[in-house]
Amino acid sequence: MELEAYIQSLGLGIESYSQSATQFHDEANQSFNIPISTIIKLKEACRELETSKVVAKSLNWSHLLRVISLLWEKDVSLELMKLLANCLRQVPSISVQIVHNESLKQLTTSVFEVRAPKVLSLISTFNDDLERRVVFMRFLFILLSTQTDDICLDMRQVRTQLIQMLKKMWTLNSSPSNNSQDNEMVLTEILRLLFPISKRSYLKEEDEQKILLLVIEIWASSLNNNPNSPLRWHATNALLSFNLQLLSLDQAIYVSEIACQTLQSILISREVEYLEKGLNLCFDIAAKYQNTLPPILAILLSLLSFFNIKQNLSMLLFPTNDDRKQSLQKGKSFRCLLLRLLTIPIVEPIGTYYASLLNELCDGDSQQIARIFGAGYAMGISQHSETMPFPSPLSKAASPVFQKNSRGQENTEENNLAIDPITGSMCTNRNKSQRLELSQEEKEREAERLFYLFQRLEKNSTIQVTNPIQQAVNSGFIDVVFCLIFQMSSESFIYHCYHSFVGPIHILLLMFSTFKFHEILHFIKISKAS
């Protein structure tokens, strides 16, 4: 289908359309023959895959990118950039026409180079073309996410320019005269773009350490000012593109504390309960958790290589004495909520990250895992982290478990109360005695429940419950045995069988079956005498 006919079928109202999407007279006098209203409608239509496929085959994207570069300061270039980004997201194959285009270099320089001739000071006039810069950064992020390393841009230079912009925007963010919401949006896009660019470029350790500390500062600030800010998520993703080994031990501990605070702000008890019950909202909640939690858990996993940091992470992530006042399955803290996510299949990737983290903190000792988290969660941790099956949770491990009490003081497991090996909660002597002793009424009630349970299972043909003694009698095994006994035994042995484990009716029947009438008469006399 020709592009003209397809666009007319969409009702976009183009009266005339040339063979190419663009027309050039020369660089000084450009003309573009598509109305901006039509571009906006086409941009919205390209949000659908089928529309994007038709448009992708019809437009010359190399020429379109050149138009965007030449008309950069006009509104039409902004809408064309949005059209290009929408279509590239749906049809990544059009990137082949873009990655080696010189116009891509010019656009990148115009956006990121602060001292470019056409761009004034970033601090004073950034808000004038704020939307234009944000749209281009989103387009570049989509392009780098779908394209390999084969691209005309100098990624090292782009990364340096992006870091300079990040520093200045962070300085601008501290100024009360600026719109914090707009600044936050730009910071979000810069952090989003840092992840794919950092994977394609090299940075000196000194410079990388500085930008690493800056990203950590942005992360901590966003958590304190607005816990729901998207800066939090993009900062954690950006950190994964840097070498965290450049941090000192104190800085690594600080990052782990920020990570735990972030986990606490994300996890909500009510949402975890929705996931456990499988309610209608569970898919949205699962998508939210799978987008936000794995990067934070991946950062904590990468911090494990620091010497002597396991003790600090254990005190942050292991259940506290307050958590153990009830079963860990009912806990409301972020530690208990993460454990509860281990049992929910819809968020299995989160369970894999967290189980691997806990397994590393316990040095792969399955005995210690079972003793800290209980037998149920220990099995889940072993399955998610692909470790060997754990032994009895009652056995002792060599290394102590570091925890914090309600006052925030460090405790080792030897100073704590005993932990229930099943639920992971504390068990006092009173609880132990209550659990071991059952009244006669409770025993009868439990026996009755089991009786009805097996009865229902037998009626449903789930299991076949057969009395083993009755089964032996029906098979004729007892008859054969007692025939041999009566042929060889004495009266004293018959008397002993009668009073021990065999009823008188069975003995009489066996005697009749063997035709030993004199033994029957004598047996009746013995029975009467007894």
Swiss-Prot record:
It comes from the Eukaryota. SUPFAM superfamilies: ARM repeat. Its main location: membrane. GO terms for cellular component: cytoplasm; membrane. It is a single-pass membrane protein. The chain crosses the membrane at residues 492-512. Keywords: Chaperone, Guanine-nucleotide releasing factor, Membrane, Transmembrane, Transmembrane helix. GO terms for molecular function: G-protein alpha-subunit binding; guanyl-nucleotide exchange factor activity. One of its GO terms (biological process) is G protein-coupled receptor signaling pathway. It is found in: Membrane. Belongs to the synembryn family. Chaperone that specifically binds and folds some, but not all, nascent G alpha proteins prior to G protein heterotrimer formation, promoting their stability and activity. Also acts as a guanine nucleotide exchange factor (GEF) for G alpha proteins by stimulating exchange of bound GDP for free GTP. PANTHER family: SYNEMBRYN. This is Synembryn-like chaperone C3E7.04c. It comes from Schizosaccharomyces pombe (strain 972 / ATCC 24843).
